[in-house]
Amino acid sequence: MGGLRDPHILRGEDGWFYMAVTDMKCALGWNSNRGLVLMKSKDLIHWDHHTVHFPTKYAGTQFANVTRVWAPETIWDPQAKKYMVYFSLRTNDGAIPYDKDYYCYANADFSDLEGEPTYLYDRGSATIDMDIVYNEADSLYHGFFKNEDLGGICKVTARTLTAPEGAP
């Protein structure tokens, strides 16, 4: 860990607190975020923490050349019965030329991510700082995010956390 930003804390289904954080190397600038930190606490005072370094974990894949993994957040996925960690991601080799939203599921002890990042949302231009909430009144997930190119806060909705592109 070189510095932390964008902390997101979630009180879990089991009463524990889960935090996902951008692992930022501040002295190296905005494109120095090669991973994220997963943290877990029973009391908000004592934390177990684990860094997920994408170039190491995903060596040989399109995710090995990340320049930034930004603003991770966590939400419980009732269908998968796991914590979903979602984040904005961009690479320096053109494979992912602008910030797009991806997700992975955290493993059982919240110390690592399972599998490769899966595409969550792409507006066709850079999107960052996604926040997803479930609204029981309309039975929809609402995703709010910043559009880097057009400015402002945008919103998308879905019936499930991992709805196919374009599906409500």
Where are these regions (language model features)?
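Beta-rich carbohydrate-recognition and catalytic domains
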Residues: 1-69, 75-168
